[in-house]
Amino acid sequence: MDPRSEVLLRQAELFQGSLLLVGLPADDLLGKLPDARGWCWHAGDQAALDARFEGRVDFGVEAPQTGFEAAVLFLPKARDLTDYLLNALASRLAGRELFLVGEKRGGIEAAAKQLSPFGRARKLDSARHCQLWQVTVEHAPQAVSLDSLARPYQIELQDGPLTVVSLPGVFSHGRLDRGSALLLENIDKLPSGNLLDFGCGAGVLGAAIKRRYPHNEVIMLDVDAFATASSRLTLAANGLQAQVLTGDGIDAAPMGLNTILSNPPFHVGVHTDYMATENLLRKARQHLKSGGELRLVANNFLRYQPLIEEHVGQCEVRAQGNGFKIYSAKRP
């Protein structure tokens, strides 16, 4: 069981009744708290939880409409996402209890200060390298709309400026990361047809491709509902249309692709996790048509080239700079 869940269960008497577990891990916590419900935005966690606790977990970027008498937020990595989620919960919990649990290395000690606008926060427990904090909501805020927290910015491309709109919690919120910048300089001569932007984030790659190659069918896929919501905002800001999917890795992508383009993730929360990218490299061939291309950017220190050659085809380094490489391989 996740150590954060173990800390909650040390104080199980506090978590009886109508409780909302927010950003909960895909473990057995709901089985230990039979009256609790969950809210998550990670498609993999949602699928795992729904398979075991069908109908007890809501998915998306907005707090569920179902009523709750207390809530526990599992601390996310991004401070601005924590602010949004705490606001959404506190606005519904006037006079009631709001809890925050997280790992010490995830910054729980500092994040606990984000409870102070709602009342006097106190630490209830410290164990398993985690902390549990609680506040009685004395000052319930007005709920802030998620769209009002969107952060638009412009990037200059060969065919003119592109507006990118990112939401709290999305990778490289409010700015273009170096890996995507290098990949955007190397999107020439892509195979025409169906193109997948894998791990689309705020949608910068998919939107740039759709505008540059308007006759291509562009699919944008991410495991995070805040990312796919951002991608939809980016498409709308540029008057573009594409299919946006929220799903867990390459298994959620369609078959018959001509191109897979990616700046793949390698973090889940505060933890390093290469599983989604390695799964992509192993299964890309199944999703590509013959002659289809996988093109991705990765940090220099990540040894993806042997995996690509083993599972996709001959791999070349198309470009490199700023600590990143562009890899390209075509399915025979």
UniProtKB/Swiss-Prot annotation:
GO terms for cellular component: cytoplasm. Its EC number is 2.1.1.172. Keywords: Cytoplasm, Methyltransferase, rRNA processing, S-adenosyl-L-methionine, Transferase. One of its GO terms (molecular function) is 16S rRNA (guanine(1207)-N(2))-methyltransferase activity. It catalyses: guanosine(1207) in 16S rRNA + S-adenosyl-L-methionine = N(2)-methylguanosine(1207) in 16S rRNA + S-adenosyl-L-homocysteine + H(+). It holds the Pfam family MTS. The keyword Nucleus does not apply. Monomer. This is Ribosomal RNA small subunit methyltransferase C.
